[in-house]
Amino acid sequence: MKEKLIQAYMDTAERFAELSHARRLHVGAIVVKDDRIISIGYNGMPAGWDNNCENIVGYTKGEPVLKTKPEVLHAESNAIAKLARSSESGRGSSIFITHAPCIDCAKLIYQSGISSVYYRNSYRDMAGLEFLTKSGIEVTKTE
């Protein structure tokens, strides 16, 4: 894939990340196949729930300490769920994610048939990237 397209798709994922109501981290994902965006997602609460993604678990230096609620859906899982509800197939597609996937999202990416992953920011746990690489999925960190 041409670098110009990679950057355009990654910038688009960043724009969708801005739609997240989370206070700790905004993550966006888009799925692309045959140079078309076939699905999008960003992290947030399930449809119909309130948009408060975190609980305040304490304060440090007067600032709230936030913990993400377990109900929050990751951007990748939202994009893959939307893809599953559509007439499109993920087989042979690419996913562009603002942040490297966690292990659970990496497993969903693999199971959905996505063949390449592009991400911009690292995640605290590399298990997701390691799983994807072991599974034969092309993984690329972009700037």
Where on the chain are the PLM-derived regions?
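Zinc-dependent deaminase catalytic domain
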Residues: 1-143
